[in-house]
Curated annotation (Swiss-Prot):
CDD domains: DEXHc_UvrB, SF2_C_UvrB. Coiled coil: none annotated. GO terms for biological process: nucleotide-excision repair; SOS response. This is UvrABC system protein B. Keywords: ATP-binding, Cytoplasm, DNA damage, DNA excision, DNA repair, Excision nuclease, Nucleotide-binding, SOS response. The UvrABC repair system catalyzes the recognition and processing of DNA lesions. A damage recognition complex composed of 2 UvrA and 2 UvrB subunits scans DNA for abnormalities. Upon binding of the UvrA(2)B(2) complex to a putative damaged site, the DNA wraps around one UvrB monomer. DNA wrap is dependent on ATP binding by UvrB and probably causes local melting of the DNA helix, facilitating insertion of UvrB beta-hairpin between the DNA strands. Then UvrB probes one DNA strand for the presence of a lesion. It comes from Cupriavidus pinatubonensis (strain JMP 134 / LMG 1197) (Cupriavidus necator (strain JMP 134)). ATP binds at G58, V59, T60, G61, S62, G63, K64, T65.
Length: 695
């Protein structure tokens, strides 16, 4: 991601910190401060004492990611950090790449730009074929993640719930690996056969990820998990004479290497003997199922199931894979009916650390994935579109995920019931490194809330500060926006129909001062930690419900916690239990923060946060000079949807390869730079690999 991999050697070496027995090199731009040193010490002690569950109760702006990075670096074990959505995952990935520029920080999220699962609607006799668009860049990052886990100890994976969906069996995936060393005895024919078994495609003209080409005694391989590096294998008399990394674009040799491990080009690759065994199992299941439908006199289902399954069996027999191969994953992995599928979690070493960021949201997500998937597949099986074994191609049930959990740290400002019941210890991170304290809370009557809010907004606008307002209904939000606008306030309304990229732009405009007030219904979502916001106004705070529950109120009040003058006004005619608990908790934290500041002579200072897209990635200093040109380019790309951006990436990749074929390497390099920026916008990463481990 970003330019950090390139910048790494220029980092201030004094700020690179290592710990005894740990392979991690932590870039510490500043030492831990506030509650961080104590939180790090307690979490590390908890892990060493063998605690299965711990909770890091970290308030907004207290540097929870930095604490996680310090714990990982001190323990020296591989780690996986779960985030509730792609946007937050990209943000975490960006931050971990900054803290660990010389270690393998990987990104494992769903690789679908668009996904329509196969489904059947019996009422209308309508079958919907599976339709999807796979994002090749994210697929490459997923393959890179599993490779790093199998090869290195200094690995951190940032993942979403995609990690609990089935992928290939790690043991069989490992069996398929091809390790090449200089001096190895192996024939060219055997190398080619192994590559084809790993689902690499031979392509002499269009050399891209997951392909290889043969020229005389030389085989060029473009590994599926690499974005910008290929391997040249030179052979002589059935012996590996030399191995080299080279640039697939320019053909320039980068370095000679003593060995290289080629990993399969898909997580679903399976050894030939396993496929043949699976085919027999599928045939046996098909016979049983057809017999069942015959007894029921359901001849349409008989014909449907037989036709579809026989076609898939033919493809498996000839090619080793078929469309929808994941529906036969139980037979391919040799699992028993009802057994959990292999997932990314199975690739983790037994001593890995797990962090569940925003755990109060994530636990609910992990709980809900199985049921939705099951309901859709049951209909497909019932009407003869799939064999019953397709039900075992599924995400993990929550209790299965729980059994596979390693030592876990829940990270949240407002832990939910599950964390409270399971935490071996709760580590508080309430004091911020900046000395900022939680907002002052004021309760005012709801009857005059709109007029009072207008006068409060005017005070903030005069001081050059921003305001967030949360309402209960869409209609109220629209009416309030209209009222404020008529009274000369620069206001925008943030609603659920706005997509992620546009949402980021709105937040950016608020920070830049294009407008002063943001009205929304749910202000709990990511990316709303804005230092310029000094007032959060909660309308109708006494109406009990999800958005006015204790946890939601604490989260919303915390949106003003990054400003020295942070204030939260709760408009209510009575104080509910949820309000009382939220106010008491905020006051408790505030008292603790103020006592710490007084004891240590700390003056609170506001957060200075550079204004950039939260999924921009990281810029190096040289990029600032080209800011104007980059801004023009970004403006064009920002108007595109995620699907359009994916098409633009494919167009640029083709253009880059065309330039390379015409030996116009300077032009090809320029297009590659453009591609890196575009990928940074879409994925929060430029697609560069983690630094190579020493060979």
């Amino acid at each position: 991601m970003s330019n950090l991999a390139e910048v790494a050697p220029a980092l201030d070496e004094d700020k690179i910190v290592t710990f005894p027995g740990s392979p991690f090199q932590l870039y510490q731009p500043f030492p831990p401060a506030g509650d961080q040193p104590e939180a790090i010490r307690q979490l590390v002690e908890g892990i060493e004492d063998g605690l299965s569950f711990q909770t890091l109760l970290g308030v907004t702006g207290s540097g929870k990611t930095y604490t996680m990075a310090n714990v990982i670096a001190r323990m020296g074990r591989p780690a996986i950090v779960f985030a509730p959505n792609k946007t937050l995952a990209a943000q975490l990935y960006s931050e971990f790449r900054e803290f660990f520029p010389r270690n393998a920080v990987e990104y494992f999220v769903s690789y679908y730009d668009y996904y329509q699962p196969e489904a059947y609607v019996p009422q209308r006799d309508l079958f919907i074929e599976k339709d999807s668009s796979i994002n090749e860049h994210i697929e490459q990052m997923r393959l890179s993640a599993t490779k790093s886990l199998l090869e290195r100890r200094d690995t951190i994976i940032v993942a979403t719930v995609s990690a609990i969906y089935g992928i290939g069996n790690p043991n069989e995936y490992h069996q398929m690996i091809l390790t090449l060393r200089t001096g190895d005895k192996i024939s060219q024919r055997d190398v080619i056969a192994r590559l084809i078994a790993m689902q690499y495609t031979r392509n002499e003209t269009d050399f891209q990820r997951g392909t290889f080409r043969v020229r005389g005694d030389t085989i060029d391989i473009f590994p599926a998990e690499h974005a910008e590096m290929a391997v040249r294998l030179e052979m002589f008399d059935d012996e590996v004479e030399s191995l080299q990394f080279f640039d697939p674009l320019t053909g320039r040799v980068r370095q000679k290497i003593p060995r290289f491990t080629v990993y399969p080009s898909s997580h679903y690759v399976t050894p030939r003997e396993t496929v043949l065994r699976a085919i027999e199992d599928i045939k046996a299941e098909l016979r049983d199922r057809l017999e069942f439908f015959h007894k029921e006199n359901r001849l349409v289902e008989v014909q449907r199931l037989e036709q579809r399954t026989r076609f898939d069996l033919e493809m498996l027999s000839e090619l080793g894979f078929c469309k929808g191969i994941e529906n036969y994953s139980r037979h391919l992995s040799g699992a028993k009916p009802g057994e959990p599928p292999p997932t990314l979690v199975d690739y983790l070493p037994s001593d890995a650390l797990m962090f569940l960021d925003e755990s109060h949201v994530l636990i609910g997500q992990l709980n809900g994935m199985y049921n939705g998937d099951r309901a859709r597949k049951t209909t497909l099986v019932e009407y003869g579109f799939r064999l019953p074994s397709a039900l075992d191609n599924r995400p993990l049930k929550f209790e299965e995920f729980e059994r596979k959990m390693r030592q876990v740290m829940f990270v949240s400002a407002t832990p939910a019931q599950f964390e409270k019941e399971h935490a071996g210890q709760v580590v508080e991170q309430v004091v911020r490194p900046t000395g900022l304290v939680d907002p002052i809370i004021i309760v005012r009557p709801a009857t005059t809330q709109v007029d009072d809010l207008l006068s409060e907004i005017n005070l903030r606008v005069e001081a050059g500060e921003r305001v967030l307002v949360t309402t209960l209904t869409k209609r109220m939000a629209e009416q309030l926006t209209e009222f404020l606008s008529e009274n000369g306030v620069k206001v925008r309304y943030l609603h659920s129909d706005i997509d992620t990229v546009e949402r980021v732009e709105i937040i950016r405009d608020l920070r830049l001062g294009t407008f002063d007030v943001l009205v929304g219904i749910n202000l709990l979502r990511e990316g709303l930690d804005i230092p310029e916001v000094s007032l959060v106004a909660i309308l109708d705070a006494d109406k009990e419900g999800f958005l006015r529950a204790e946890r939601s109120l604490i989260q919303t009040i915390g949106r003003a916690a990054r400003n020295v003058n942070g204030t939260a006004i709760l408009y209510a005619d009575r104080i509910t239990d949820s309000m009382r608990k939220a106010i008491d908790e905020t006051e408790r934290r505030r008292a603790k923060q103020m006592a710490f500041n007084e004891a240590n002579g700390i003056t609170p200072r506001g957060v200075i946060k550079r204004i950039k897209d939260i999924i921009d990635g990281v810029y190096d200093a040289g990029e600032v000079k080209a800011e104007l040109l980059a801004a023009q380019e970004r403006a064009r790309y920002e108007d595109m949807s995620e699907k359009q951006v994916s098409k633009e990436i494919k167009r640029l990749e083709k253009l880059m390869m065309d330039h390379a074929k015409n030996l116009e390497f300077e032009k090809a390099a320029q297009v590659r730079d453009q591609l890196a920026k575009l990928k940074a916008q879409l994925f929060g990463a430029s697609g560069e690999e983690a630094p190579m481990p020493p060979v």
